[in-house]
Amino acid sequence: MPFYDNVYYPYPSDPPGTHSSAGIPSLLSSPQSQPSSGSQSRPAPSTMSGPLTSSGASTSIPPPFKFRSRRENVDWRRINAVDVDRVACEMDFQALQEHINAVTFCSVEGERCHRCQSPVDPALIKLFRLAQLTVEYLLHSQDCLSISLQAAEERLLAEAREREQICVQLQKKTQDAKALKEELKQRKKIIASQQAMFSAGISANYHKCQHCEKAFMNASFLQSHMQRRHPSEFDMKLMTDNQKKIQTVKLQDEINKLQEQLTLVTSQMETQQKDYTAKQEKELIQRQEEFKRQLEIWKEEEKMRMNSKIDEVKQACQRDMDSINQRNRNLETELLKLQQKNIQESMQSVQTQPNASTSNEHWQEVVKLQQKLHKQEVKWTGKMQKMKEDHDREKSLLQEELCKVSSAVSEGMEESRRQVQELSHRLQEQQQIITSQNKQMKQISSKPPTITVQREGVSTPSPETKAKVVVSEQSNSVHKLDPIVELSEEDKDSSSISESPTENRSWQKEVQELLKNPGLRRDMRLAAQHNLDDRLQSLGIKGVSGLSKNLYKSSMTQIISDRRKKLEEDPVYRRALKEISHKLEQRVKERNTEQPVKSKLHEQVVQSRPRSSSFPSTVTRVMSGPASKQQRTPQPVPRSRTNVPHKTSTPLQHRRTPPFSSDEDSSEEEEEEEEEEESSDEESPQMQKKTVLVNSSTAKAQNTAKTQSTAQSVRSAVALTSAEPTNVTTLSDSDWTDGSEMEEINLSQLHKHTDQNGNLKNVTHSNVKALGKSLEKQLAARGPKKPAGGVNTFLEKPTDVRNTRQNAKKELKYSDDDDDDDDDWDISSLEDVPAVAKPTQCPVPVRKSLDKSQDTSTSVWGSSTGKGHKPGLTDAGTASTLKSSLVTVSDWDDSDEI
């Protein structure tokens, strides 16, 4: 038998008819395997054989053969009880059958001799195991053979039974065939006799049945056949012809009656159907007419209700708008009164010279009041905008409802269309007015007044007799103006020299006339915002929203902590910062020494040209006394304080990335700012002194190169912020393009950090504090001396500066206390401006714009002549009074620690 991998695969069973499987001698199925008692029954198969099925067709092949494991112990008592010789002599196969499982599947490997306890010989064990495997294989072969034999026997029995059934059927068929043959013979005989009769010509005596195929030789036979086989037809035939006629007449009468009844019923049904349809049509017409009348009534009611609602909404909106406008006008009048009062008090304070503490408290109260007014205005403007949006939303909903009944309210729709046309016409007129006003503003901005700096002669170095800056006073009503118009350098220089006082006066008159229009500021602001958005979108800059104050604070605290950890842990980082700061300081010195000295003609007269079409901010005339005023040419003599003219643009500035420059340039500038600021802690006092002197001289040289600036008050703020490098971070001249933003500088905020002599107080910033102390120690011995020809650019009292916001810019606001909301981050600039420096004693509230329609920003530094400066020319430790609304997390400026 075939084996593979110790598994037996038997051959297929032999086809029926062969006796090879039956003829193979078996150990247990042989005739000698019968018990000695003489019983003729077959022995049962071995215990390994599975259950057999009843039929050969359903008999399944036994599972594949596999040798079993031997785990059973040897039952020596049963084996000792067997007499092997007797079994061999008597051929007792029954005893072998009883012990075959125990012998075949027992394990003798662990058996030992009972006497000496020695293990069994391995050769003997091998022989015994071989015998066990042979017996197991023979048992499996026996099972397979018995199964195949039983299946063959079952098939044989089934075929025998089928053979018997076929034999019985065959006998029945033969008998039926014999009977059919006899019947066929008889029919043939009858047919032959009938054909013979027909052919003999005896058709006259032939009578055929009309209802069947039979024919009779005699009429009597046919009649008897009719009575016997067709009785109904026979009775009908016996009836007379009269009876048939009478019956047909009756049937015809009944048919006629039924037809008449049918016609009558159909006519009645038709008339009823016509009446019913006519009635239904009348009812339907009446219902339609009634529905139309109800629909018309409903349409009229809806139309009246909608019109009443629209009128109510219009009246409510008009009342709200009137109340808001009235409140706004009241606030504006109060603001103007407060400003005039502040100006008068400032003039009185200049004459009386009150102490610094009372003036600071007074100005703090003024700033707080201004902030409150600004917040109220923002609040009311937001409410007004919300009400307008609600009104527009309700109006749209009402229009949608009106569209659903457009057939009934066509007149109302026409009226609304006329209103829309009128509004569009008004809007076009307003746009035309705005464009014309923009043109006028541009013309006016191209002709700014000439502002001359007059200073008094100083005979003593005492602080009380310092020369004050005397400038022309302008109107307080400064508003938003048109976008920036860039001029070439030659045009700037030529136009700045050729302007005269008459042009200044005419320019101021035109400005005042234009600003009398109350809706001008709002219209110009909207136009400026649209122009800025379009310009930014054309340049590929998408609109961004600024960070909130809480998010900014949390981000900056995390950045500062990470930066400090990095400085403490990594010495290489500290060393690299020192090296870079030293290199930057050297570059600053080289750049400052290379600045050319301008001609004295430009130093005599400081002319201001607005950077944009915005008007100059409010300027207060400051007088130090009745001393004679005369124009003197400032001499570039080194001074103890870096008091520079109003138009100076010193290198002590934080260069800022232009609004439309690449991110790589801005990142480089930020890195250089950080490195230069951190290098300030390592500078020696002597180096700081030299830097200040060089900056003051170069600032004078750059004075005449500036051809566009803001009003004189803004210039004084610029001079103050540039005088102490630890207080203000200014913008580079290259920032002021058509798409750049204008900054808002509150002069009162700056004067809160100054004393009576115009010197800046110490701030909380560590670098600023150290640098300020070093400068004070070096300059303490010199006292309050002012060099000959010097000009004091610091105002004794703060002036109210309102910056004009340009149409193409969004405002930058000062950093405030915790009450600042997300409105401080509404700028869409890409620049990072460090936060404002706070004083050491107490946080002074800063001024916010009082009126967004009036709150405008002006250029702090004027023309773009400083474009030659590279990013990174920043003063070490310079803090900022401005805060950008867009703060990047990667900003490494030291001023962020404030």
From Swiss-Prot:
Function recorded in the entry: Molecular adapter that recruits protein complexes required for cilium assembly and function to the cilium basal body. Required for establishment of left-right asymmetry during embryogenesis. Acts as a permissive factor that is required for the proper regulation of Hedgehog (Hh) target genes in response to Hh signals. Acts downstream of the Smoothened protein to modulate Gli activity in the somites of the developing embryo.
Biased composition (Low complexity): 25-46, 495-505
Lineage: Eukaryota, Metazoa, Chordata, Craniata, Vertebrata
Skewed-composition ranges (Basic and acidic residues): 797-815
Tissue distribution: Expressed throughout the embryo starting at 12 hours.
Zinc finger (C2H2-type): 207-230
Protein name: Cilium assembly protein DZIP1
Transmembrane segments: none
Feature: compositional bias, Acidic residues: 662-684, 816-826
Region (Disordered): 14-66, 435-509, 585-739, 773-878
Record bears the keyword Coiled coil: yes
Source organism: Danio rerio (Zebrafish)
Keywords noted in UniProt: Cell projection, Cilium, Cilium biogenesis/degradation, Coiled coil, Cytoplasm, Cytoskeleton, Developmental protein, Metal-binding, Nucleus, Zinc, Zinc-finger
InterPro entries linked: DZIP1_N, DZIP_RILPL, Znf_C2H2_type
One Pfam family cited in the UniProt record for this chain: Dzip-like_N
Single GO term (MF): molecular adaptor activity
Any one GO cellular component localisation term in the record: non-motile cilium
